[in-house]
Amino acid sequence: GPMFSGHTPFDASGMIVAFEYVSGRKREVQPADCLGLVLVWTRTRGPLNVLQLVFGLTYTNLSVYLRFGIRLFVETFRHDPLASVRIPSAETIETFKDAFAVRHPLLNDCWATMDGLKLYLQQSGNCEIQERYYNGWTHDHYVTSVFCFCPDGTIPIAFFNVPGSVHDSQVAEFGNIYNRLEEVYLSTGAKCCVDSAFGNVTREYLYKSCQDLLGSNAPTREERLLDLQKKRQATSARQTAEWGMRGLQSSFPRLKDRFVYEERGERRITLKMLVLIYNMRARMVGINQIRNTYMPHLNRDANNDVQF
């Protein structure tokens, strides 16, 4: 309402600016229409022709209101407790550690998992720029992101829209993710479970699914078996990050489209909006494989527990 009515995307500068209608024809597109356009866009793929028919807008107006709606969503919900990307309280982290310990008893101090995600990007006409986004292993162009996932399915830490040539561990370094995970470890003793991509050095606040904690240095056979079991449980726990990536991409098929190359910040704002919607959906709707697996009690219906 107020954000939509008090701003306009039709300024001569191309920016979204504060505006008050004092004369002339009012906009026929209402706030609900703009929000619906943004949400339907996230749930579809391909060109916008179908959305033109659904919303009755020409291509130019549809593109303008889509850009307008995405920015209004980010501005409205970036500090909302249901949608924001934030590290939970110490009490909540303790419940996350308990949730992991139920399924993985040897990882009783794990509170989250982390992994990287590559999203397709159009090639730039400039060879030097194109090289930044090219990944030689998969022979394509990407933007790279790193996300952490909690047992309730939410994203507490994220860093996205990094050129595809950057390794996941470097993304975590550039995005200050390692420092934030270390702060959580120092304050609560909680660790994050990752795969072998995150750093060659040992970090005490990370569980690596391939990390040889003791290996042949273990003095007894029992300790070697315990070390092997811990690595297997870390591998199993890290699967939650794959579920989270799948949940993010299946919830928003638009992510599977190839992003248009531009340098105006559209990708960053779009990715930020999708993460906010994902968190809000995880907290309010609760349809999430991670949450259903690790914290099924959050989905219990009181009607099934109370006998009338």
State each model region's role.
Residues 31, 47-308:
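Short, well-ordered secondary-structure "scaffold" segments embedded in the functional core
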Residues 1-30, 287-292:
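Basic, low-complexity segments
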Residues 31-44:
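Short, amphipathic alpha-helical "recognition" segments used to contact nucleic acids or chromatin
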